[in-house]
Amino acid sequence: MAARHQFENSNEIGVFAALTNAYCLAAVGGSENFYSVFEAELSNEIPVIKASLAGTRLVGRLSVGNKHGLLLPTSATDQEVMHIRNSLPDEVIVQRTEERLSALGNCVACNDHVALVHPDIDQETEEIIADVLGVEVFRQSVAGNVLVGSFCKFSNRGGMVHPQASVQEVDELSSLLQVPLVAGTINRGSDVIGAGLLVNDWIAFCGLDTTSTEIQVIESIYQLHGADSSGAVRDIRASLLDTLV
């Protein structure tokens, strides 16, 4: 299923939360409803953790993780790191990384097997991503955008990329990631997919402005109903082509 959600008055829920197959981080200090929606939907499956990073609520943009691990910026305090580490399953590795591109959630997109990273990310950071998250790493842009974490979002079952990605680029990325992909939007036409969408292998949360058509595409491409995603890919490509024409 895909559920609409908001952080205070913001539809960019991916800025204030992070979701994987093993845990969910939700920003502290917002309305209790923001946390309680995640808790109601997820707590029977995975831990939902109230957290801050570097004294901010931007937990989704400052971190990147999957079921194997979680990477945090060096600006995260010892207390914040300890709280997160103590709240996560023991098998999840938590590590800080000295990366100048400290908004890791903007610069990295990953699932449990592969990661796309900003082309200018440090070599040491690339190695840490591969080691801690247990993924194969590819330096990549999406539709000419180097902030791959902002402009694409993929799980182990499917993914969505910037609406201006060409059919050829979508096909090449799909082959690279080994999951079906579609070029699409979130929050009524927004191309900043990573900021407006949280998804794992069985559930998605999207901003309150997300349209019914966008939700239908999300549920299909991420196979949240066990649906075949090929129909959604064809439908959204057709609608995008109609828009461009």
UniProtKB/Swiss-Prot annotation:
Q: Cellular component per GO?
A: cytoplasm; nucleolus
User: Please, one GO biological process term?
Assistant: ribosomal large subunit biogenesis
Main role? Binds to the 60S ribosomal subunit and prevents its association with the 40S ribosomal subunit to form the 80S initiation complex in the cytoplasm. May also be involved in ribosome biogenesis.
- This protein's gene is called EIF6
UniProt record similarity statement = Belongs to the eIF-6 family.
Query: Which protein is depicted?
Result: Eukaryotic translation initiation factor 6
Its subunit composition reads: Monomer. Associates with the 60S ribosomal subunit.
**InterPro entries annotated for this entry?**
eIF6 (IPR002769)
Q: Where in the cell is it found?
A: Cytoplasm; Nucleus, Nucleolus
Instruction: Record the organism.
Output: Ostreococcus lucimarinus (strain CCE9901)
Checking CDD domains in the record gives:
IF6
Gene Ontology MF term list: ribosomal large subunit binding; translation initiation factor activity
